[in-house]
Amino acid sequence: FNLKYTDSGRMTANLISPKMLDFSNREFNFIEFPEGAHLDIYDEENKKSTVVANYAIVYNKTGIIDMQGNVVLNTAEQDTLFAEQLFYDQEKEWLFTNKPVTFKTKQDLINGKGFDSNSKFTNAEVLEIDGSFTLDE
């Protein structure tokens, strides 16, 4: 299954999964991907970041994608985030979680509880940090 998301004709996200369950007949409708999902996120410059997870659910009314289980996010800059759960707000193009994460950059390995970032990762922030990281003086 292949689900594309666009904004003003520009593709912002593409969700691919082997199986989709459509619950659009519910009052709070959603689409479930019980066999895992692969999500490509494109920023305004068409740079691609990728998220894979064991399970995903898309809440149609809110535009939130909830990815769970062995979530791995690879940014266009080759940074990697490991988490058990990660949310993507399609409207705000925002990624976030309040679960434990490990964020690996070219020079640092940062552990924390929570993560916030725009889809460009220009303001990626690991919350409640624990681990080694480099400080600019």
Predicted features along the sequence, with ranges:
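Mature-chain termini and adjacent capping regions
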Residues: F1-E137
